[in-house]
Amino acid sequence: MRVLSRFIVAASDARHFPGEDLPEMAFLGRSNVGKSSVINSLLGHKIARTSSSPGRTRTINFFEVRWPGRPKPQIIFTDLPGYGYAKVLREISQHWATFIEPYLTKRASLALCLVLIDSNIPPQNSDQQLMDFLRAVGRRLVVVATKSDRLSGNQLASSLQNLSRTFREPRLLAYSAKTGMGREQLWQEIRAAAAAFSEQRALPS
């Protein structure tokens, strides 16, 4: 699916967040897990900045997404700071209470959390802690196993089984930004979350 997209804002404080009119899809994960590459792959062009340096993103970056032929955007992608590297962990933790935690706990337009994990390494405690936190605050989530093209069929099956058993998450998708593996399945999850958000908004208050 080809879509149109535009960068909106890089927010380093909750006061800089845009309005909450559209459903938002948050991309979370360890540093260098490939969040920006997954976003660029989904959108079909390079809009999120990629870097080989861990922890490059220090802000929540908002991108509006519009279906072709539609005059207005339909959803928002948000790229959150990565975690897991000691040299950036202190800086991220300093900002957690300022804008990351308020975004994940209080943002009314947050429709789906996409937790990206590297399929090539064992399950990490930091990923488990994030998922436990998201479940505790009632967030809808899907786990995306990135860089899946680097594994053979048997290796990938074993990795997914291990990740599913560890994280106890039924919605687990193998993804490759390089080959496009899992792209349509992930779009299905995003569209379903957007539809659920719209239905919830339509209910009488």
Spans of model-derived segments:
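Residue-level signal for inorganic ion chemistry
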Residues: 63, 146, 186
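Conserved G1/Walker A P-loop phosphate-binding module
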Residues: 1-85
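Switch II of P-loop NTPase G domains
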Residues: 17, 57-62, 75, 81-111, ...
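Conserved nucleotide-binding/hydrolysis micro-motifs of P-loop NTPases
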Residues: 56, 82-84, 120-122, 147-152, ...
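Conserved C-terminal guanine-recognition region of P-loop GTPase G domains, centered on the G4
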Residues: 99-171
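Conserved protein kinase catalytic core
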Residues: 15, 46, 85-88, 124, ...
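Short, glycine/charged-enriched secondary-structure capping and boundary segments
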Residues: 21-22, 40-42, 90-93, 128-132, ...
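Canonical P-loop GTPase G-domain recognition
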Residues: 2-15, 150-205
